[in-house]
Amino acid sequence: TGSDKFVLIVWAGLVIEKIIAIDKIDDTQVSKRINELRIEHRIPLKNVIYDADGLQTFTRNSANSGVLSGATQFNNNAVPIKVNGKKENYKNLKAQCYFMLADMCKDNLLFIQEKNYRTQIIQELEQINRLAFSDDGKLALEKKDAIRERIGRSPDFADAIMMRMLPEIKGTQKVGIIWNN
């Protein structure tokens, strides 16, 4: 059960300027499309973040040694990033980023300039639920399959937006393109 959409988001700071969502895309076209968009918007490769967990072989090779070499990997199940030298109490990087995204939304720090997908984005973000504390006391999110079951699709827009929190957590806010496949 893969993703429903290939989602690319172009950011200017914390403003979503452009969203491209493609229902089906050939794996060989993924890196080509990202690179075209990156060049069009003059975004350095280091400011491109991609979902490393969802990559197919061709795209993974491109990210490692091809036209996307130098882009930033996002690994959902990676260990949370230390903030101010302190270990964070999240199950994984994805949970850490979603909790930061929730705080930023509450504080009205994000703006979606792109109008085409607002309804889907809001619907998806409203479905992200925290799980009860586990035995280890870590903050965690419910599985994507539960969300897919409720709304009838994968929360691909929400996941792509969530990945934008990575540079915020790291303290390196420059980012241009986020893509979730």
What kind of region is each of these model predictions?
Residues 1-99, 103-181:
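RNase H-like, metal-dependent nuclease domains and their acidic two-metal-ion catalytic environment used
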